[in-house]
Design a protein with these regions (language model features):
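Basic, amphipathic "hinge/linker" alpha-helix immediately C-terminal to the N-terminal HTH DNA-binding motif
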Residues: 59-77
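C-terminal regulatory/oligomerization modules of transcriptional regulators
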Residues: 97-129
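Key DNA-contact positions within bacterial/archaeal DNA-binding proteins
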Residues: 38, 93
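Alpha-helical residues within the helix-turn-helix
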Residues: 31, 48-49
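N-terminal helix-turn-helix DNA-binding core of bacterial DNA-binding proteins
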Residues: 2-35
């Protein structure tokens, strides 16, 4: 995955996550991503131009259907990788952090294999610790 594609998915995923609790503003996103508000504003403008987000009244950032689809797919992929790592005995916090790194380089074929593995082994209680 390219660096720009990874950045796109990070922003969309964070907007998706933050919007579950409250309306999302550039300052919220900057704080969550650990970047400046100016950096967020520049990238949000690009996301608007590509129809991934819209910025409405009171500067509230929302995902468009196109952006929401990418965010949801990214969240599903992360969840699949995290669940696989946890089934192998990796503690939850570490599994979540590692899933972010692994998911970025995962081919569609490997993702599908992880997903099938999780589905087949859902009922099994793996604990390899």
């Amino acid at each position: 995955m390219s660096r720009e594609s990874s950045r796109l998915e990070d922003y969309l995923r964070r907007i998706h996550s933050l919007s579950r609790k409250n309306p999302v503003h550039a300052a919220d996103l900057a704080r969550d991503l650990g970047v400046s508000r100016a950096t967020v504003c520049v990238f949000i403008k690009q996301l608007q131009e590509e129809d991934y987000v819209s910025v409405g009244e009171h500067h509230i950032i929302t995902l468009t259907p196109k952006g929401a689809q990418i965010a949801e797919n990214t969240c599903q992929r992360l969840d699949t990788v995290r669940r696989l790592l946890e089934s192998l005995g990796v503690p939850g916090e570490i599994a979540a952090r590692d899933a972010l790194e692994i998911e970025r380089g995962l081919s569609p074929q490997s993702y599908e294999a992880f997903h099938r593995f999780n589905d087949r082994n859902r009922e099994k209680a793996w604990d390899l610790r």
